[in-house]
């Protein structure tokens, strides 16, 4: 499951993301954060952390450096 999620994120980064403007307010980017979280915490908790991060990535959030802890 973990490998499948990471492959889906990499597919998104390679084929879908280049067509969009760069809009992530965080370092590392939300997709890299998702990969790091899934690798560190597994598919379930890592995905939950990634979804929470993506929800915070909006114009009303300051952003900045936010690594997986």
Curated annotation (Swiss-Prot):
SMART domains: Haemolytic. Disulfide bonds: none annotated. Keywords: Cell membrane, Membrane. Coiled coil: none annotated. Its main location: membrane. This is Putative membrane protein insertion efficiency factor. It is found in: Cell membrane. Belongs to the UPF0161 family. It holds the Pfam family YidD. GO terms for cellular component: plasma membrane. It is a peripheral membrane protein. PANTHER family: MEMBRANE PROTEIN INSERTION EFFICIENCY FACTOR-RELATED. It comes from Clostridium beijerinckii (strain ATCC 51743 / NCIMB 8052). Could be involved in insertion of integral membrane proteins into the membrane.
